[in-house]
Amino acid sequence: MSDDSDLTSRRKPKSRRAPKARTRGQRVRRGILFTLLALVLAAGGTVYWLYSQLDGNIKSVDIDKALGDERPEKLPTAGQNLLVLGSDSRAGAENKELGGGGAVSGARSDTAMVVHIPEGRSKAVAVSIPRDTLVTRPVCSKSDGSDLPEANRVMFNSVYSLAGPACVVKTVEKMSGVRIDHYLEINFAGFKDLVDAIGGVTVDVPQDINDKASGLNLTAGPHKLNGTESLAYVRTRHGIGDGSDLGRIGLQQQFLMALLSEIKSQDLLGSPASSYKIANSATKALTTDSGLASLTSLAEFGRSMNGVDPGSMETIMLPVAYDKQDRNRVVAAEPQAGELWEAIRTDATIPESAKKSPATGG
């Protein structure tokens, strides 16, 4: 009896401890699973919040709805055409300060380029439209719903301030016969912040620049420019050439190539959320057509451009001649301008004669 009692007494503690050990282990494993699940959900929620915020930063314009069907025909082999505008909007405190204070109201298209990406997307060409070009502005709808009548001999950069981006697209399509597929606009402050966010952009300054109006002073040679310096560089007109808009177009084109090279090297378009700081700066600055107005659409467009080498992108100024009535203005030079637009419309090689501008700004 005593032996049996001893055996029973030894077994009882063992039978009581085993369930407790299993329960404790289950609780630990269950706790780990719940923690991991919470972390996954939190990470997913954070990613969703980041994407939602970045998507919400992008402003858009429904170009197709605004322009309707009265547009150039989209040819099967026409590639892709993107209108890029640099807006000198004074909206917001930072834009106002960068734009030179309160002396100028409203906004204008300070920089305008038609970027043509041929079929296959292995190369591209950027055509700069001088802001002082006299154009025929078509009938456009204003933001209040009223119509802005057609007008001849108006400055190209005034179209934006009078009727907004859709009218700029319509004006470019009218003067070129080129169907614009996408629209992208960046403002003063956004340009500055984007350059600062990516760590600056290196450019090879072609000649000494001493612009008293902007305070930009650079010697010829390579310089890594921050955001404020970059903005002054692409906007300087008194520090180079004849002081007109034509002189600075070369600097704008050069800077665009350097900026695109930096963006491509950091894969900012292919993976726009890889760096939240950069993506936040970029998306806050952007206004696009509705087809590009999301991170997903921008990333897809960026990945489709991976085959394009910014170093081989051709940059051309729209051939212009000094206006006979006002030497401070220019007009499209014919037949060069017509040949240039025809080549872009048909995705053909641009003839050398279409790259020569009678007015150079030198």
For each feature predicted by the language model, list its residue ranges.
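Non-catalytic, solvent-exposed segments at the cell envelope interface
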Residues: 2-362
